[in-house]
From Swiss-Prot:
Residues at the active site: H155 (proton donor/acceptor), K159 (proton donor)
Entry-linked SUPFAM superfamilies: Glyceraldehyde-3-phosphate dehydrogenase-like, C-terminal domain, NAD(P)-binding Rossmann-fold domains
Keywords tagged on the record: Amino-acid biosynthesis, Cytoplasm, Diaminopimelate biosynthesis, Lysine biosynthesis, NAD, NADP, Oxidoreductase
Record NCBIfam families: dapB (TIGR00036)
Protein name: 4-hydroxy-tetrahydrodipicolinate reductase
Amino acid sequence: MRRIAVVGAAGRMGKTLIEAVQQAPGAGLTAAIDRPDSTLVGADAGELAALGRIGVPLSGDLAKVADEFDVLIDFTHPSVTLKNLAFCRKAGKAMIIGTTGFSAEEKQRLVEAGKDIPIVFAANFSIGVNLCLKLLDTAARVLGDEVDIEITEAHHRHKVDAPSGTALRMGEVVASALGRDLEKVAVYGREGQTGARDRQTIGFATIRAGDVVGDHTVLFAADGERVEITHKASSRMTFAKGAVRAAMWLDGKAPGLYDMQDVLGLH
C-alpha cells in the first residue's frame, strides 16, 4: 500500500484529498497534519472528511508522524509548503505540491530539493487542465503572431493569489510556444487610456466571486474569427484525484522535479 499523508487536512481541499486517497486502490491515508494550534488536533481524519472513523488522528506536528508515510500531499500556502519541503528533503520523503503563489526564487528552491527527493509540482492536477495545456501549445504554434491572446480566470472569493497559478501556467505555455518571455509580455488588467493593443502582449483578467471552483479560458482572437480553449472545474475532487494519481505514479521514481504532464505522459 502506498502510504500517503495530507497536510492542511482540516481545510476544504485537505478533506477532499483525504476522501480521494481513501477511494484510490492501493493507497491509504496514514497521516494527516494541520496547524499545531488547530482545535481539531487529535480528531479522526476520516470523521473530519465525513467518511467515518479510519483510525488516523490529526497531528499538529509533521515530524511526529514522519515514520507513518511515504509521500506528502501539500496544497497549502507557499510559506508552509517550503517548511514541509525542507523537512521532506531531509527525511527523504516524496512530495506532491499543489500550492500556488510561489515567487521565482521560491520555485528555485523546489528545483534544488528535486535533486534529493522525487517531487511532482503542478499549478493544476486536473487531467482536463493538463490536456488543455497540450492543446494550448498546439494552438499557439499554429495561430502564431496573427492573434491577440487573452486569459481569463475565475475562482471563489477565498482564493488569495491572482492570477491563479493555472492561468499563469497557461500563459507560460503559450508564451513559450511563441518564443516570448511571459514576464515581459504579460499585462495584468487594464484601466484608463491604455492605447491600442500590442499584439505581442498576453492579457490576464481575474474574477473572484462566490464559490467558483475554477474556470479558465484562453482566447485567441484574429480578425474574423476567435478560438477559445476553456476548462471549468465543478468539484475540487478533480484536483484531488489527480494529486493521488501523481502520488501513486511517483512510487519508485528517481529524485527530480516532475509535473503533471510527466504523470500523464503528455511531454
